[in-house]
């Protein structure tokens, strides 16, 4: 019996191979064997830890910049330019932190797909995502040719 995949909008994509599950609850299929899925699971977990830490550090740096500005260490006159630099650095840190947190959400979704036995299959077509793509971006959700328009991490 196959698993029916659904598009993010809820429409059916078609049948995926029926997954099997190991004792840890990792789902694998004929296209993505247990060894590969475990390797990707471990890579996703490691990347999640790294990005969560990175997001926290960047937020801490942004808050520290605000605290330093409030303590009066920053000149806000036209000659110094320090105030503008601090604002730019703070905004950059917050933007990078938000990107890291967004990637963590995508990683969590990939980990969920592993537990459902649908990892490695396009959320758009249900076709297998090439292993090389998953090795490069373990949280990838679509095939390269399906990713039309826009720049993204998937």
Q: Which stretches of residues belong to each language-model region?
A:
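Interaction interfaces in information-processing and related assembly proteins
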Residues: 1-113, 153-154
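Short functional micro-motifs and their immediate structural scaffolds
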Residues: 112, 128-130, 151
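Residues immediately within or flanking Cys/His clusters that coordinate Zn2+
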Residues: 119, 140
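Short cysteine-rich clusters marking metal-coordination/redox-active sites
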Residues: 122-126, 143
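Zinc-coordinating Cys/His ligand positions in small cysteine/histidine-rich zinc-finger domains
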Residues: 130, 143-146
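Short Cys/His-rich "knuckle" micro-motifs
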Residues: 132-137
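Short, charged, intrinsically disordered terminal tails
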Residues: 145-154
